Structure formats: structure tokens, C-alpha cells
Amino acid sequence: DRLVSRGLGDVYKRQKRFGSAYAPLDESLSRVVVDFSGRPGLFWDVEFKREFINDFDLQLLEEFFHGFTNKALATIHVDNLKGANAHHQAETIFKAFALALKQACSMDDAKKDRLPSTKELL
């Protein structure tokens, strides 16, 4: 089940495949690296300063990333490098994730003339 390949259609064969990004917010800094390798794996290095933001259980963030990783068949590294405010930590993780996804799903200019086919022979 390739969530990303179905969503991107023919673009999938021409995408860059991996991306990385840092995102800051005040004292917090996070890094996310995404690789649509076909091998799911989540490497989570995040220690939130609190367990909840209001009523939201921050353990659900890791569960979200596990689900995405497994459905997208991607390897994802999530590292919160600095942070004193749990809200800022969570926000920088999602900002970095969005930027890394954008990069990984963008077209690779080296592959732009390649016609998508099952064996890339066309």
C-alpha cells in the first residue's frame, strides 16, 4: 500500500524521493528527514517538556508519524534538537515535516525527461 505513490500518480517515479528540513520557533528547533525508500521506519528523538498541550496527548504525535511511515513506506527521522515549550516543539516538528515532504515529493530535474513505465524502458 503506497499512500504517496497513489497520491502523486506518475510524478512518483520522477520525485526526488528524500528531503530534509530544519524549522525554528523561538527557543525550539527541530529536524525532519524523509526518504520514500519503500522500507518503513520511524526514528523518533523527541522529549516533550510536558505530556499534554491543553487536552491533547503529545504521545499522539509519535503515533501519527508511525501511521504515516507505515502507509507511505517511508523512513522518517524526527529530532527535536532544542525546546523548552511543548507547543513550540510540536509546531517545529510539523513545520520541518511539511518542508521535508515538499522537498521529497518535488520533481527531480535529472528525471524530468524520463517517461514513467513499469520498467522505465520507454
Regions found by a protein language model. Name each.
Residues 2-12:
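Single conserved hydrophobic/aromatic residue that forms the stacking wall/gate
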